[in-house]
Design a protein with these regions (language model features):
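Active-site anion-handling motifs in enzyme catalytic cores
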Residues: 1-164
């Protein structure tokens, strides 16, 4: 699949820390580099996602992330999905340290970069987009997340749910 443009994936809920001026500055940097910019968030309206809509919603987000050249996000799951999809990503601190902590786990992936200061954005974009190796090695994923994946599978089995 040919990748085109960039995506901002910022919080828009009550935990949002990014101010409008900074978001506009990020948009301007991305527009100057990539031309086409999309905006998205992982939250779509109030309430919970219905079980029958979960897979479709995940697929839509994965497809969106897989279609762009670069993502700038303050969302933990956005950064993780970029790692899985091989999408260059610059992750911003959001005050909750979750993104920064996970960024430490992913620091060996050259196409994922965590920054605290927006002044580092240009260099970070250069760095992640120039990385030639864009995949998360499965053995590394298994060793880091194997116990969690097994726990999830055990819970699904106990609840009578089928695998994914």
């Amino acid at each position: 699949m040919e990748r085109y443009g960039a995506l901002t994936l910022f919080r828009s809920d009550r935990e949002q820390k990014l101010d409008a001026a900074t978001a506009q500055e990020i948009q301007a940097v991305l527009a100057g580099r990539f031309g086409c910019i999309e905006k998205a968030d992982m939250v779509r309206g109030p309430g919970k996602v219905r079980p029958q809509d979960r897979q479709r919603r995940i697929d839509e987000l994965v497809n969106l992330l897989s279609s762009v050249e670069c993502v700038v996000t303050d969302r933990l799951h956005g950064m993780i999905l970029c790692a899985v999809t091989g999408t260059p990503c610059v992750a911003l601190g959001n005050g909750y340290h979750k993104v920064q902590s996970c960024g430490e786990w992913l620091k060996d992936l050259g196409y994922i970069r965590f920054i605290q200061d927006i002044g580092e954005l240009d260099e970070a974009i250069d760095s992640v987009c120039s990385c030639s190796t864009r995949y998360y090695p499965e053995p590394a994923m298994q060793s880091r997340f194997g116990e969690l994946l097994q726990y999830i599978e055990d819970v699904r089995t106990d609840c009578g749910e089928s695998e994914y």
